[in-house]
From Swiss-Prot:
Stretches with biased composition (Basic and acidic residues): 72-85
Single biological process term from Gene Ontology: base-excision repair
The keyword Nucleus belongs to this UniProt entry's keyword annotation: yes
GO molecular function terms attached to this record: 3'-tyrosyl-DNA phosphodiesterase activity; DNA binding; DNA-(apurinic or apyrimidinic site) endonuclease activity; double-stranded DNA 3'-5' DNA exonuclease activity; phosphoric diester hydrolase activity; zinc ion binding
Cofactor note: Binds 3 Zn(2+) ions.
Biased composition (Polar residues): 55-70
Database matches in CDD domains: AP2Ec
Main location: nucleus
The protein's name: Apurinic-apyrimidinic endonuclease
Residues annotated for Zn(2+) 3 binding in this entry: 298, 345, 347
Keywords for the protein's UniProt record, in alphabetical order: DNA damage, DNA repair, Hydrolase, Metal-binding, Nucleus, Zinc
Enzyme class: hydrolase
Length: 396
């Protein structure tokens, strides 16, 4: 019988997959064993998808992730979000020289941060195991960081193994990283305010699972996008449902705080105003288990101008009066490609967008923000450099 050579997709970039590819390509598989070839191809595709998901950061949306439920029914808005360039820095497959270079930069970041009470970080990769997120964060000079506690592009997951938990706690002991400075990001598949019963149930169970995983890791906060009406219900109904989702998770967890993220007001999304977040908080039964994360790009695009000291103080005063400073648990640090009030959720490097450096200098010198996780979600490639820029803005 004729032999058949195994073929591979050319777009497979993962070092791990390339290594497996090199081992398997020379194999000759008989036609009668076609099932083996299919199994190999399926395994390779699964590995590729898992690695892509582990290295995807907030805002790095892809077609499989975006649904009408979790963003909006507005095709133009969905297109904007699909094209976001933000990705977490990849560290898998790096050479020893690259690793040393990365760690050297991390040391410089920590030196620059000396004397500052601000806790800067970014969304880090957990490729290779959740504990790698801690090692990566420490290596690059993070004082705080965001991550995904599971593959955020699929609904179904295996339970978290004891080995995963043990490896995580080993990394915590070795790095002494403060667990209250880790703010995992919820899956984009979820819509905590969905008007459709089936999607709502799946979202609630997914959020509960992610929060229970976070608690096993000693993490105290969980950040998520509030939700969307998807054009099928009134905002008040959607916000009430979001509060009920929070209550559902709180009742089945011990102490994790569910942190609502401010949104840009795009499409049918909830969270574009401080008043909407306040409405949700007022409906939540246990107030100590809910909080807010201010995203600088989102509030700016939503109409909150923070570019001058006067404007900044007015916005912060408004937040304190409407929501309350006691609910502020984290900040996402991003410049904006869109202008104030544009409702365009597109992040930009610090000082290179429409917000400008002045606003971030005000943030870095605001005593009310000391000790709060401040997480960069700017486009990939400059996180350590941007953290040093930010720390140098702290003049206190």
């Amino acid at each position: 019988m004729a032999n058949k050579k195994v073929t591979f997709r050319e777009d497979v970039k993962s070092p791990a997959i390339r290594k497996l590819k090199q081992k398997l390509t020379p194999l000759k598989i008989k036609k009668g064993r076609g099932k083996i070839q299919k199994h190999i191809q399926k395994t390779l595709q699964k590995m590729k998808e898992e690695e892509e998901s582990e290295n995807q950061s907030p805002g790095t949306t892809v077609e499989e992730t975006l649904t009408e439920e979790n963003i909006s029914t507005d095709k133009e808005e969905t297109s904007k979000l699909e094209n976001k360039p933000k990705k977490t820095r990849k560290t898998s497959g790096e050479t020893i020289a690259q690793k040393k270079s990365r760690e050297t930069v991390g040391v410089e970041v920590l030196k620059t941060s000396e004397g500052s009470s601000k806790m800067l970080g970014f969304h880090v990769s957990a490729a290779g195991g959740l504990e790698q997120a801690i090692y990566n964060a420490r290596a690059e000079g993070c004082r705080s960081f965001a991550m995904f506690v599971r593959n955020q592009r699929t609904w179904n997951h295996k339970p978290m193994s004891e080995e995963v938990v043990e490896n995580w706690w080993k990394a915590v002991r070795e790095t002494n990283f403060p667990l209250d400075q880790i703010v995992p990001h919820g899956s984009y598949l979820m819509n905590a305010g969905s008007p459709e019963a089936e999607k709502l149930e799946k979202s609630r169970l997914a959020m509960l699972d992610e929060c229970q995983r976070a608690e096993k890791l000693g993490i105290t906060m969980y950040n998520f996008h509030p939700g969307s009406t998807v054009g099928k219900c009134e905002k008040e109904e959607c916000m009430t449902t979001i509060a009920e989702t929070i209550d559902f998770v709180v009742e089945k967890t011990e102490n994790i705080i569910l942190v609502l993220e401010t949104m840009a007001g795009q499409g049918n999304s909830i969270g574009g105003t401080f008043e909407e977040l306040k409405f949700i908080i007022d409906k939540v039964k246990v107030k100590s288990r809910v909080g807010v994360c201010i995203d600088t790009c989102h509030i700016f695009a939503g109409g909150y101008d923070i570019r001058t000291q006067k404007a900044y103080e007015e916005v912060m005063k408004n937040f304190g009066e409407v929501v309350g400073w006691n609910y502020l648990k984290a900040i996402h640090i991003n410049d904006s490609k869109g202008d104030v009030g544009s409702k365009l959720d597109r992040h930009e490097h610090i000082g290179q967008g429409k917000i400008g450096k002045a606003a971030f200098e005000l943030l870095m010198n605001d005593n009310r923000l000391d000790g709060i996780p401040m997480i960069l979600e700017t486009p990939e490639g400059k996180y350590p450099e941007e953290m040093m820029i930010m720390y140098n803005m702290d003049k206190r």
